[in-house]
A protein has these predicted regions:
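C-terminal/domain-terminus segments
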Residues: 86, 94-106, 333-354
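Positively charged n-region of N-terminal signal peptides that target proteins for export
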Residues: 1-4
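Extended active-site neighborhood of metal-dependent phosphoesterases/phosphodiesterases
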Residues: 40, 49-50, 55, 95-198, ...
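Active-site glycine-centered loops adjacent to acidic/histidine catalytic or metal-binding residues
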Residues: 32, 88-89, 126-127, 204, ...
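Short, solvent-exposed loop/turn elements at domain surfaces
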Residues: 25, 35-42, 179-182, 210, ...
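N-terminal active-site segment of His-dependent metallophosphoesterases
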Residues: 19-99
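Short acidic, glycine-rich surface-loop motifs adjacent to enzyme active sites
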Residues: 195-212
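Bacterial N-terminal signal peptides
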Residues: 6-14
Length: 354
């Protein structure tokens, strides 16, 4: 077990460019995708909820999910994106055996990669990527999915990774490890890279609460990690919630902005306008409602810590899918959110270099 964890936590580092290269570039960001196919499910779904998810996924991958990826691939090429990042839940999971889960993850990754043949495709683990039949299975995601990511990075395999793009540091975190390991990984990455322009934390689970459905299902060690990151010019990129959102935390030490993305095919070209539907008050009220039962005291302490860490704001948007292009330059990091073939529906500054 110790040997396995040692391998999992290898720090994978790659310098894609020399420091002298142009400091402006663009990155494609994809949210949850949930690739699925009947060939991985020979057994009946173990619950009605999972049966509905399978039906949803099969319908998505008959057309909408493919068209979303086609659009993203064309956009990445026309905008000269230098790499693409997928925010976890690249696959549905729930495969009948560990071997089938590994095959599902490989096919999911290669399906997405086929739309970005000329640039590296990176990913982090999502909760569905480690979902076996009725139980959690880490090994296929560690060996297969993260093995494919390691090849894209050109570095050693690990379920968490880092790389430098010029003056910018990217930290891809495995949010399904113990809290101490998550904190230690981020801390070491920052210590090893003191000279950054921007830091990008790539995580499936949000760092800052971004949903009213499970407001405390966040990255392990999220408070400590946020304290470390707010001292840098940091952008947090997350998935998991199936809704676009922009959440910020401001304290005396700095400001963090988190962008959550979603790329579920069922919400692609849905015809809905992209508009805010919930704010931080909604998230806070949902969190307060969880203070009950046998874990009430523990939850209350978490909520008190959340409140003490700074001032928050949030815009959680209506359910609509798409993708994001990050325009990273010397003055700022700006996100362009696309939910169709036309112009971006939202432009948002995520960090400023001043």
């Amino acid at each position: 077990m110790k040997k396995e964890l040692c391998v999992i936590l290898i720090l994978s580092t790659l310098f894609f460019v020399q420091a002298a290269e142009n400091s402006s570039y663009k990155v494609m960001v994809l949210g949850d995708i949930h690739y699925d196919n009947a060939e991985f499910h020979q057994k009946e779904a173990p619950s009605k909820a999972l049966k509905k998810e399978r039906i949803r996924n099969y319908e998505m991958w008959k057309g909408p999910s493919v068209r979303l990826l086609e659009s993203a691939g064309k956009r990445a090429k026309s905008e000269s994106c230098v790499f693409a990042i997928q925010m976890g839940d690249i696959a549905q999971g729930d495969a009948d055996t560990p071997e089938l889960l590994g095959k599902m993850l490989e096919k999911a990754f290669r399906t997405v990669k086929s739309h970005f043949p000329d640039i590296p495709l990176l990913a982090v683990k999502g909760n569905h990527d480690i979902r076996g039949y009725r139980k959690t299975i880490q090994r296929p995601a560690d060996n297969v999915l993260m093995g494919l990511v390691a090849k894209e990075l050109g570095a050693g395999k690990g379920s968490s990774w880092t790389f430098r793009k010029g003056k910018d540091l990217y930290i891809g975190i495995d949010g399904f490890r113990p809290e101490k390991q998550c904190i230690a990984f981020v801390k070491k990455a920052l210590q090893d890279n003191p000279d950054t322009r921007y830091v990008f934390l790539v995580t499936h689970l949000p760092l800052i609460p971004a949903t009213v459905h499970s407001p405390f299902w966040n990255l392990p060690g999220n408070f400590e990690i946020a304290d470390l990151l707010e001292k840098r010019k940091t952008v947090v990129l997350a998935g998991h919630t199936h809704s676009f959102s922009i959440v910020s935390r401001k304290s005396r030490n700095g400001k963090l902005i988190q962008l959550v993305s979603t790329s579920l095919g069922r919400d692609w070209l849905s015809g809905k306008p992209m508009q805010p539907s919930l704010d931080w008050t909604s998230v806070r009220e949902a969190a307060q409602k969880t203070v009950r039962g046998k874990n009430a005291e523990k939850t209350r302490r978490i909520l008190e810590t959340l409140d003490s860490k700074g001032e928050y704001s949030a815009r959680i948007y209506t359910r609509i899918s798409g993708y994001v292009i990050l325009n990273i330059g010397e003055e700022r990091v700006e996100a362009a959110i696309y939910t169709g073939e036309g112009k971006p529906v939202l432009m948002e500054i995520l960090a400023e270099n001043r």
